[in-house]
């Protein structure tokens, strides 16, 4: 499996994380799901109700509005994203404990170094973590 992510959406995600720094940012990732690839079509920044550099909790009202919009667009929920302002882009113990949806993709953007690093994971049984390759797409091409 591979994730295709337009560079423009990646930059939107980075901008969201930098705007919220030093707090964690969070949001939803939607698109088209095929057998061998996930095509990201849109990201939806959410409010982090925890207002924290170490935790995030999405606003349920905002989530509900996004779910309605996603249905109207004909897309599917791929997963969610959040930033790690001071740590690497890998799931923390808390991230794993809160990963209840085994089909969701968890995108984590690290701002720990000068160049942001985005990685994507699937988490099974709240402990088995597997990284999924992200292919960045520019103007419809790799």
Task: Give residue ranges: language-model regions.
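Short, well-ordered beta-to-alpha junction loops that form the rim of enzyme active sites
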Residues: 83
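Conserved beta-strand-loop surface patch within small alpha/beta domains used
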Residues: 1-77, 86-142
